[in-house]
UniProtKB/Swiss-Prot annotation:
<keyword id="KW-0808">Transferase</keyword>
<dbReference type="InterPro" id="IPR004730">
    <property type="entry name" value="Transaldolase_1"/>
</dbReference>
<dbReference type="GO" id="GO:0005737">
    <property type="term" value="C:cytoplasm"/>
</dbReference>
<protein>
    <recommendedName>
        <fullName>Transaldolase</fullName>
        <ecNumber>2.2.1.2</ecNumber>
    </recommendedName>
</protein>
<comment type="similarity">
    <text>Belongs to the transaldolase family. Type 1 subfamily.</text>
</comment>
<dbReference type="GO" id="GO:0009052">
    <property type="term" value="P:pentose-phosphate shunt, non-oxidative branch"/>
</dbReference>
<dbReference type="InterPro" id="IPR013785">
    <property type="entry name" value="Aldolase_TIM"/>
</dbReference>
<keyword id="KW-0704">Schiff base</keyword>
<dbReference type="InterPro" id="IPR018225">
    <property type="entry name" value="Transaldolase_AS"/>
</dbReference>
<dbReference type="InterPro" id="IPR001585">
    <property type="entry name" value="TAL/FSA"/>
</dbReference>
<dbReference type="GO" id="GO:0004801">
    <property type="term" value="F:transaldolase activity"/>
</dbReference>
<dbReference type="Pfam" id="PF00923">
    <property type="entry name" value="TAL_FSA"/>
</dbReference>
<comment type="function">
    <text>Important for the balance of metabolites in the pentose-phosphate pathway. Involved in xylose fermentation to ethanol.</text>
</comment>
<keyword id="KW-0020">Allergen</keyword>
<dbReference type="GO" id="GO:0044577">
    <property type="term" value="P:D-xylose catabolic process to ethanol"/>
</dbReference>
<keyword id="KW-0570">Pentose shunt</keyword>
<feature type="active site" description="Schiff-base intermediate with substrate">
    <location>
        <position position="133"/>
    </location>
</feature>
């Protein structure tokens, strides 16, 4: 019998590796890979990645400028070095994240994205292998709209916890979205003090709702479930366009022979009764409807704050080496 991982791929789901630790991902044969500041920070503390930091430091020193400018340059180059190494292992695309401190600044997000794409270009990597990852705030959704429409740069809207964000992202023409699963479960468990079966899992339900909405209304934006706490959440989403999975859960799926039947089916979405909404030209309605979802508001705030904090930690490591 084939492994649960192979069965998951057979349902039509594209498997993506969620890790900066590129040494460990090859054996799972993922199509794409995702990174974020937290994953890069974790990987950068490992000895085998020291040479990537050295490259970034040398680059920043050569460019010169103030110490803060050098730190920014080193961080950008480090993100690109990780992306470059990951792209040697996978056939598809890598997601590289814009600093979360720009989550409420459309112009700064666009400029940072253009700069990252330029840095990749200097390494001989074309923009069609990169997804620029931006938090799914109103400003982030607008940045994605500009990048997709005016620059042909593909985006991954992340920290997505609600259908409101997903609708805005689809209308913006985002290439891909990352609705989070495990972090939604965390919130509900803390809030209700209940345990949830994989079928009841509110994070799983959130992704199913978004998937069905997109398929019913014919959006081409890829739905990539993210942030998993266990393999049950993953197998409940078999058939989702993409799933991005950490190496430890990929290992569990590889070592399991549990059956993985298809659970999400685009062809069944057409008959579902789902109300169509529009947000892309109505910031006030987007903000109000999003604000009505306490879980999504709290988790987006927390996610931006954590990614920003990990970027600050990464910068402090780089600053020490630049001194």
């Amino acid at each position: 019998m084939s492994s649960s991982l192979e069965q998951l791929k057979a349902t039509g789901t594209t498997v993506v590796s969620d890790s900066g630790d590129f040494v460990s991902i090859g054996k799972y044969k993922p199509q794409d890979a995702t990174t974020n500041p937290s994953l890069i920070l974790a990987a950068s503390k490992k000895a085998e990645y020291a040479k990537l930091i050295d490259v970034a430091i040398d680059y920043a020193k050569q460019k010169g400028g103030s110490i803060d400018q050098q730190v920014d340059d080193a961080l950008d180059r480090l993100l690109v070095e990780f992306g470059k190494e990951i792209l040697k292992i996978i056939p598809g695309k890598v997601s590289t994240e814009v600093d979360a401190r720009y989550s409420f600044d459309t112009e700064a997000s666009v400029n940072k994205a253009l700069h990252l794409i330029e840095l990749y270009g200097e390494q001989g990597i074309s923009k069609d292998r990169i997804l620029i990852k931006i938090a799914a705030t109103w400003e982030g959704i607008k940045a994605a709209e500009i990048l997709q429409r005016d620059h042909g740069i593909n985006t991954n809207l992340t920290l997505m916890f609600s259908l409101v964000q997903a609708i805005g992202a689809a209308e913006a023409g985002a290439y891909l979205i990352s609705p989070f699963v495990g972090r939604i479960l965390d919130w509900f468990k803390a809030s209700t003090k209940k345990e949830y079966s994989k079928e009841e899992d509110p994070g799983v339900q959130s992704v199913k709702t978004i998937f069905n909405y997109y398929k019913k209304y014919g959006y081409n934006t890829i739905v990539m479930g993210a942030s998993f706490r266990n393999t049950g959440e993953i197998t409940e989403l078999a058939g989702c366009d993409y799933l991005t999975i950490s190496p430890n859960l990929l290992e569990d799926l590889l070592n399991s022979n549990e059956p993985v039947p298809k659970k999400l089916d685009a062809s069944q979405a057409a008959s579902l009764d789902i109300e169509k909404k529009s947000y892309i030209n109505d910031e006030a309605l987007f903000r109000f409807d999003f604000n009505e979802d306490q879980m999504a508001v709290e988790k987006l705030r927390e996610g931006i704050s954590k990614f920003a904090a990990d970027a600050v930690t990464l910068k402090s490591i780089l600053k020490e080496k630049l001194a």
